UniProtKB/Swiss-Prot annotation:
Gene name of the encoded protein: nadE
Annotated organism of origin: Burkholderia pseudomallei (strain 1710b)
Presence of keyword Signal: no
Biological process terms in GO annotation: NAD biosynthetic process
Functional description taken from the UniProt entry: Catalyzes the ATP-dependent amidation of deamido-NAD to form NAD. Uses ammonia as a nitrogen source.
Full protein name: NH(3)-dependent NAD(+) synthetase
UniProt xrefs under InterPro entries: NAD/GMP_synthase, NAD_synthase, NH(3)-dep_NAD(+)_synth, Rossmann-like_a/b/a_fold
HAMAP family, per database record: NadE_ammonia_dep
Lineage, top ranks: Bacteria, Pseudomonadati, Pseudomonadota, Betaproteobacteria, Burkholderiales
Entry keyword Magnesium: yes
Amino acid sequence: MSRPDQAARRRAIAAELHVSPTFDARDEAERRIGFVADYLRTAGLRACVLGISGGIDSSTAGRLAQLAVERLRASGYDARFVAMRLPYGAQHDEADARRALAFVRADETLTVDVKPAADAMLAALAAGGLAYLDHAQQDFVLGNIKARERMIAQYAVAGARNGVVIGTDHAAESVMGFFTKFGDGGADVLPLAGLTKRRVRALARMLGADEPLVLKTPTADLETLRPQRPDEHAYGITYEQIDDFLEGKPMDDAVAETVLRFYDATRHKRALPYTMFDWPGHPA
């Protein structure tokens, strides 16, 4: 791909993902708190629900949600934020999860261990005759089951509380397709949309997060065989490079091509289910 064509694609993707050329943490916090509050009031909902993992994304989204419901209550509209701990058995980074909860200061915290449900589904699949190529493939499948069990738990609580599920997706994860479809990608409201990873961190700092939380190495931590595997190991590039791609900063052509490959391969994750009427190139 020529350099001008690559630059044009970068601009188009940044626009599609709503990455602004400018950023002010205080202004962005105000916009996003107001958005969540307006959504709840307009929809007649009374709760926000979000799983708090101990990472910076869920911590930041959770704090924004808590501030949104506090704003609503101050105006006379009753709403609450429910933080959920959703470990798979014992959590390796338990101390980080506790630090995150201290920052978020949720109205309520519920803990649901997804291990029994996830393991039961894996066993049921085996009993039904599903075989795997190897242990690594089985572990990959189990990882996605974990993410989807967490989604089930959050929607169960949201249904019981007349609430909405908050998602943690932002532009840097979205462009790479780094989320489980109908797992952590399953949500109603995305208060971090349009932000690069460095901007999520800047927003968290402005909201009062401490540096160990802000700078924690991002990990989905879904793989039992490779616990706490950093996201960047899966990408083969860094979040700094992904952010540079989205913010239009100078970068190596090969790195930009890597981002474009991930973007193209994961297009289906960012779309509603396809029909023959909207799949590119298919005669309807």
